[in-house]
Amino acid sequence: MVNFGKKLMADQIPEWKGYYINYKLMKKKVKQYGQQVQQGEKDRRRVLKDFSKMLDDQIEKIVLFLLEQQGALASRIEKLGKQRAILAEQPDISAIAELREAYREVGLDLIKLLKFVDLNATGIRKILKKFDKRFGYRFTDYYVTSRSNHPYSQLQQVFKHVGVGAVVGALSRNLADLQERQGSYLSIYDQPSTALKDPIIDMINSSVDKLTRSTNFLRFLGQHALIVGEESPSTAEEEEIEDQKYHFMSLMLNLVNTFLYMVNTYIIVPTADDYSVSLGAASTVCGVVIGSMAVAQIFSSVYFSAWSNKSYFRPLIFSSIVLFLGNVCYAMAYDMKSLTVLIIGRLLCGMGSARAVNRRYISDCVPARIRMQASAGFVSASALGMACGPALAGLLQWKFKIYMVTFNQSTLPGWVMAVAWLLYLVWLWISFKEPNRATEVNGTQQNPASVQRADIEQLENGLAQPLLRDSSKKDEDDDEEVDDSEEGTHDSRKPATSIGSAYRLLTPSVKVQLLIYFMLKYAMEILLSESSVITNHYFNWNTSAVAIFLAILGLTVLPVNAVVGTYISNMFEDRQLLMVSQITLLVGIIFSFKITSTYSVVQYVVSALVTFVSAEVLEGVNLSLLSSVMSSRLSRGTYNGGLLSTEAGTLARVVADCTITAAGYLGIGKLLNVTLLPSLVICAASIASTFLTYNSLF
């Protein structure tokens, strides 16, 4: 494997040689410090102080050179601007062409500077990881916290790179102004939609986007999916391999599976209480009916995740068949007068949850250039299914019999979904294409592209990742000079092989993010699952009214994420949004309580909207942070970060639905406050936990 030390030497610009991070020296120092600590010559506090000072000096060297180069580029642009002003008064086509070439040369030099920043960023990240691995100490957390929060932070000055943005803006404007359009010179500020798309500007913007990991709506949506493996291939050969694996119709089938499953989950919510009553149970038993699907999903997520190591087609076939049978059982329970059959039907539906397969397919089989779009499609399909489920239930208000089979508002959701899954099964059988798989390595399947990516360190790898975070297997330092413990063993890079080993990889920051995810899913499930019971008790809403209310809640998901992903997340840090959205969620929960003798529709609807929207915002920010602070060993394999977050969310739904059923024994009048109390406590605990780990959330 190409080690980073050699890559740094090969890729650095010769005339800038003295300004790169001295990775070789830093690596030797880490080894030396390790030996000194083992021999008792230095204590750890002294080592931390010395190493911090050395790293500070290296970063300062990079910062000062970066600022110097930015100033030089700005000076060149200023001089070219004077020439442009002269040409504006006395146009000369040949002179304009020469001037545009001069601007392009500045652009090429800017790209060189971005590559300089990238190599150094990768070097800093790697040396921090090496130090952590050597000493078993989260030095990265300490260093990031102490340096990034300082008002004179050099880390912030480099990696926010405001100066680069100013240079890009100046280049874009000047190149656009040199483009003759109908005999005049137009400003990109006057007509941004018609601004010149010069290839050099596209190259610069691409580099800046990768380096900053800038947030936009598409990326914000994609982060909801917690789909890992977003590195770009470094060679045309790798891109060709990825393209060979990619099959558009197979991707669409995975997204449709996601959509149908979410419809299947929420289509029964408006009528579950009536169905329970018709079978002789209390209306609050709807909690068990709704939650039984989540109970089964806890187990199905694990075996589907493991199964996807070997195949995607067979798990999807199995999922469709089980979901078809589950919905038939759910619908037939009415005529069989059996609550047991009803719950078995929902359990079967939960056993057919293939969301782990859908995530894995996008991660492994979709080319990197469109993986974020596919991830956003996964989230959008989930949100659309969540809205369509209750809306569809509101439309299924007919009542008739065919022979001995009853079709009404309780059974029609089951029959409709059974037909939908049967049609999907036929489409899947005809159209799905199983991607080629390489030999199995260490219990996990590796495709040719991932094998090559593991062997080739690439420039884009650092650009695509934040500076100080754990990276994937290919980001590990497999230097040829191996000593006792400096170069991690193969085991230190293997994915987690069990829930227990995955849990041991969780840092306090990750645990807090999983707690927050549990909390928000719990609050949302309480709100949605008991909505039919609460609204019927207090407001006498019928099934159609409940369905419309739930559909409206579901339809807020994409607009809210559009606002947050496009605007708000670019103005504030993720951790700031995390704290604010939790506080807003807490406010929504508090206002949901029935404190006075009357409980109005306005209070319920407004508090529900605040709670639901806050939880949606929180989910996106939470998963974004979770992907940043999670160990690289949890980015692949069966027990990956996506599975852990799914398990946390599913467990929250199970607990919430059980809480509803248990609280029902105290009476419908007490149901609302009793079920909201755990939400209040867990939300307060998550806010306190966030406050304690706030400085490590990067």
From Swiss-Prot:
Gene3D superfamilies: MFS general substrate transporter like domains. One of its GO terms (cellular component) is membrane. Residues 2-145 form the SPX domain. Residues 476-486 have a biased composition (Acidic residues). Pfam families: MFS_1, SPX. Residues 467-495 are annotated as: Disordered. It is a multi-pass membrane protein. GO terms for molecular function: transmembrane transporter activity. InterPro entries: MFS, MFS_Domain-Containing_Protein, MFS_trans_sf, SPX_dom, SPXM_SPX_plant. It comes from the Eukaryota. SUPFAM superfamilies: MFS general substrate transporter. It is found in: Membrane. Keywords: Membrane, Transmembrane, Transmembrane helix. PANTHER family: INNER MEMBRANE TRANSPORT PROTEIN YAJR (PTHR23510), SPX DOMAIN-CONTAINING MEMBRANE PROTEIN OS06G0129400 (PTHR23510:SF78). Belongs to the major facilitator superfamily. This is SPX domain-containing membrane protein Os06g0129400. The lineage of its organism: Eukaryota, Viridiplantae, Streptophyta, Embryophyta, Tracheophyta.
